[in-house]
Amino acid sequence: ESFGLKQGHKTILQPTRIVRRKGIENAIDLVENLKDPHYKLLISHKAGDEGCEYAEWIKNYALKHGVDLRLAQKFISSPWLHQRHHLNGHSLWNVYAHADFVTFPSLYEGFGNAFLEAMYFKKPLLVNRYANFVNDIEPKGFDLVVMDGFLTPKTVARVRSILESSQQRQQMVEHNYRIAAKYYSFAVLRRMLNSLFTNFFGIDTT
């Protein structure tokens, strides 16, 4: 309710800062092409340290294309900060929990925290094929909606199909969760770190 969302609305979450390399105009184009006024685009973060010019352009772009855009940065506090009270009781994790679909159409990323967050919260995901995704993530076999630099009617149709089919959506996110747990869990990280310490220092940390 803090974001003006009501029962029956469907939340498309863009869980990133509003900076040019995030390709947020693609998320706007997606919502526009879904052609359903119940779909609302929610951006979780503020513009950050790259200025507000792109953020203003994004707001105008959404308005021009008839997309209901909600900006949540005033209502969300970081889940990593140990605050006595979250602002209005919301953290980024609350927003993920209530999202129906996640967009991550970045032009380039180091890795992409939002990708793993979507897997953890079992949310279907649209992702652009940025270089590190192609090299490091795509070969793992995730079931994703993938765009290659631009949206196509086929991409939009698949998103619509996923949003309208709870069975398809559940199969997709459960599959992705298993793959993410196999390759990116804390248990995997511990094994990798232990191997590094053993190889370099002869120390077994298990």
Briefly describe each language-model feature range.
Residues L5-K22, I28-V31, L41-I43:
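Conserved donor-binding/catalytic core segment of Leloir-type glycosyltransferases
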Residues G112-F115, F133:
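Short glycine/serine-rich donor-binding loops of glycosyltransferases
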Residues F104, P124-N128, I137, L144-V145:
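Short hydrophobic beta-strand element within catalytic cores of glycosyltransferases
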Residues L107:
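Aromatic "clamp/platform" in nucleotide-sugar-dependent glycosyltransferases that forms part
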Residues D100, K122:
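A short alpha->beta transition loop at the rim of the catalytic pocket in nucleotide-sugar-dependent
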Residues C52-N94:
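Nucleotide-activated donor-binding/catalytic signature segment of Leloir-type glycosyltransferases, i.e.
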Residues E164-T198:
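A charged, aromatic-enriched C-terminal amphipathic alpha-helix characteristic of glycosyltransferases
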